[in-house]
Curated annotation (Swiss-Prot):
Cofactor note: Binds 1 zinc ion per subunit.
Function: Binds 16S rRNA, required for the assembly of 30S particles and may also be responsible for determining the conformation of the 16S rRNA at the A site.
A Pfam family assignment: Ribosomal_S14
Organism from which the protein derives: Parafrankia sp. (strain EAN1pec)
Protein name: Small ribosomal subunit protein uS14
Cofactor(s) it depends on: Zn(2+)
Family listed: Belongs to the universal ribosomal protein uS14 family. Zinc-binding uS14 subfamily.
Residues where Zn(2+) binds: C24, C27, C40, C43
GO cellular component, one term: cytoplasm
Lineage: Bacteria, Bacillati, Actinomycetota, Actinomycetes, Frankiales
């Protein structure tokens, strides 16, 4: 789980636009966040396996 202070800090609008970064909406993880879903790779995988993301399927080739 992310530190609450860092989650609050990321929610504020930065002074310069390039300093802004995405965080997972579910757990607050700052790295490897898919912008389309707003989730990190860990949460995306968990929710996809449970079927909570409509239209997302496990690929196989």
């Amino acid at each position: 789980m992310a530190k609450k202070a860092l989650v609050e800090k990321a929610a504020r609008k930065p002074k310069y636009a390039v300093r802004g970064y995405t965080r997972c909406q579910r757990c607050g993880r700052p790295r490897s966040v898919y912008r389309v879903f707003g989730l990190c790779r860990v949460c995306l995988r968990q929710m996809a396996h449970r079927g909570e993301l409509p239209g997302v399927t496990k690929s196989s080739w």
